[in-house]
């Protein structure tokens, strides 16, 4: 039974590795591979909180912090204020902001080709896009096919070319 507080001690839970062409996509892949059944950085249990509550929650260094950061951005708290409290580098906060802004765009129902392409580049799954836009997952898959937006997979050579990567 591991404590939720994060620190320098190794934990037996919550460790993932994700590789992608952008940080945003890798972060979302990592989120999806956690055994928490979370599909989005925007969790209603945090996005519905007041700014004062979020500012207080940002002080907690635990496994919910990423969701609290995303909810804070969603609710209009400045990256500078979040940085002052968390000391998270602005580079990372900007990347999280990119994800939050895209999800806000999707929640307006926007789903033109450029928006869908950018959402996929940022690592959004068809399921999350469909839920945010308010359509079926099949509709999103049909749009991807129509607009030739297809997933790609790359092989990662974990043996430094000692053996042929397959």
Regions found by a protein language model. Give the residues of each.
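ATP-dependent carboxylate/acyl-activation modules
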Residues: 1-166
């Amino acid at each position: 039974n591991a404590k939720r507080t994060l620190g320098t001690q190794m934990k037996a839970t919550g460790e993932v590795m994700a590789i992608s062409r952008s940080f945003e996509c890798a972060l979302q892949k990592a989120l999806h591979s956690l055994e928490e059944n979370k599909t989005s950085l925007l969790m209603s249990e945090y996005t519905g909180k007041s700014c004062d509550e979020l500012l207080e929650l940002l002080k907690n260094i635990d496994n919910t912090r990423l969701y609290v950061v995303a909810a804070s951005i969603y609710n209009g708290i400045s990256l500078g204020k979040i940085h002052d409290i968390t000391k998270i580098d602005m580079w990372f906060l900007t990347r999280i902001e990119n994800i939050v802004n895209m999800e806000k765009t999707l929640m307006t129902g926007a789903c033109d080709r450029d928006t869908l392409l950018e959402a996929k580049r940022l690592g959004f799954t068809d399921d999350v896009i469909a839920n945010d836009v308010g359509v079926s997952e099949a509709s999103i898959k049909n749009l991807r096919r129509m607009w030739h937006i297809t997933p790609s997979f790359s092989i990662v050579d974990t043996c430094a070319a000692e053996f042929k990567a397959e």
